[in-house]
């Protein structure tokens, strides 16, 4: 009987079981021999024709499509193929950016999806979508709840796959400016499939989701409507939506049409892609607006750029967005903005990029997990996978980035840490693509050196050279849009400028933008002016008047560089125990790091160097290879990482803390403050009143020790918000990332601020 730490390889669910989940006839790919699958060929041709029509008729440079159900995933490949063909046939579509939102109640891994696609012949030499299929599978889609974003074709195709409860995932998305134009509903989402759920649940190991949450219902359709344009279409496949005679719970065509009409979808069809009337009913459209306003009221304490409460101020692609900071956060944001065609000016105080905390030679990349799989844990799983995709995309274009996706082995190093790790392992049925428990023997085989205790292994983790990653992001950004990097450019102060005052932007041109501009200063001299400014300056992010109260602290970290020799040279995975140790890179390992709050200096410290040399010996006192860690040559690097108490990064609008405190004091000084229900009224005020912010000033920081894992997704979400798009994280997570969260938590609970 294996112990709880011994790993037994999990095989993907049998193809026969997966095929039973996806209704017969759904596999839509047109095979080479159409006689063997004429229905699939007809379906896929109609789907490609539909996608081609919608792509060619797109009225904006941004086209957002929704899909209820992932199914066997072939439909996303057909959209991808259609986009490539349309761009080839119509050069004017080169600027079109397509965003596909997929909502699927039953999670499926990349390994299982690969198994399905292999059975369909999608990887065959004569398959027109083989390159796309291979690229998507390499993205390591995992069986986790929430969104997983895939950025493809130089940012021209973004696919968000949302696994989990349909209604919850839809409800948790903030209403965007760029709303869904068309919805495509796959057959298995229309059926309750009660009998199937009862007989196959144990085999499929699906999340225990109620049957009626897995199908279209009125509540789900209303949330789809909230996210949609007024004239958005809802397409249904009539043949596959027809319930069997034995299924009394399945939805009928008439029921679907009625529900779609009530939710305000102007065009729908029980027959494949045959659109009906374009007329819009004022009543359901009014209901949609009410739903949007309700969400806005619920989330008022968490201001989002370009939301209903903070009306979008037109920013042309030619108007440069300023990013202050040349580390991993600023570089990732520049890339995400460039993929959207935005001009960027990045100010870096150093003479080279990535010279702060990003300057370490090797940094571990793996998710932070908690026993209860909290929002923090879910965010880091999403972020880790997205960061990995970013890395692979840059490597595919031959950008030089030192890295090794060699896995990460986590072990305890004392009784407390061992108990904590065991609690994490036992807390959830973790997807194998995220992490799995290993015995000491298995850990030793993975690490290449002897490990005498069990551990938790992250197979898709590893290490990345942070500064090379950051520089590659910026080089890629420069190839996509007007991105300028200004080195040796210290910004010590930012002040609002009146719009009617002639001021030069970063390119030396007089800005014509309406509204307030931000002036960037150093030693009293203006360096530039921009309509939108993002502070992503790492350890100096709280050096500005507007951000000095942000609740994050600087921690010094000294990482020691040790020569690769002896048994240590055999190490081939990252070890995280009391500190971390990397495999060799250019004949040198990294071990560390120290953790000193509010450091007085960043000079080399002999004591910290010695402590680093002891970390692995303390973790594995009975083993010999840690003795090969030699720190005597005083080779090390020191940086400061900004850490928040709750371990979430800070991303979003810069809060106006003075105004928050002023309003708080005014409310407390009110004559009604002594009334019994006044505290509840104050809580309601803070819940529903837009929280004060510095308009068009944003924060991206507080990445702590896991910036390599969290920065790319946090930057992508901020870029999406700045451009009025749907971000790939929930409203709840956005609130947890918001820089004002420490104050809002107290105010929403009726607690005193000080």
Swiss-Prot record:
EC assignment: 2.1.1.61, 1.5.-.-
UniProtKB keywords: Cytoplasm, FAD, Flavoprotein, Methyltransferase, Multifunctional enzyme, Oxidoreductase, S-adenosyl-L-methionine, Transferase, tRNA processing
Major localization class: cytoplasm
Any Pfam family matching the protein: DAO
InterPro entries on file: FAD-dep_OxRdtase, FAD/NAD-bd_sf, SAM-dependent_MTases_sf, tRNA_MAMT_biosynth_bifunc_MnmC, tRNA_S-uridine_synth_MnmC_C
Subcellular location as annotated: Cytoplasm
GO cellular component, one term: cytoplasm
Region (FAD-dependent cmnm(5)s(2)U34 oxidoreductase): 324-754
Gene Ontology molecular function terms on file: flavin adenine dinucleotide binding; oxidoreductase activity, acting on the CH-NH group of donors; tRNA (5-methylaminomethyl-2-thiouridylate)(34)-methyltransferase activity
An annotated GO BP: methylation
Catalysis: reaction(s): 5-aminomethyl-2-thiouridine(34) in tRNA + S-adenosyl-L-methionine = 5-methylaminomethyl-2-thiouridine(34) in tRNA + S-adenosyl-L-homocysteine + H(+)
Co-factor requirement: FAD
Region (tRNA (mnm(5)s(2)U34)-methyltransferase): 1-320
Described function: Catalyzes the last two steps in the biosynthesis of 5-methylaminomethyl-2-thiouridine (mnm(5)s(2)U) at the wobble position (U34) in tRNA. Catalyzes the FAD-dependent demodification of cmnm(5)s(2)U34 to nm(5)s(2)U34, followed by the transfer of a methyl group from S-adenosyl-L-methionine to nm(5)s(2)U34, to form mnm(5)s(2)U34.
Sequence similarity: In the N-terminal section; belongs to the methyltransferase superfamily. tRNA (mnm(5)s(2)U34)-methyltransferase family.
HAMAP family: MnmC
Record-given protein name: tRNA 5-methylaminomethyl-2-thiouridine biosynthesis bifunctional protein MnmC
Source species of the chain: Shewanella denitrificans (strain OS217 / ATCC BAA-1090 / DSM 15013)
Gene encoding the protein: mnmC
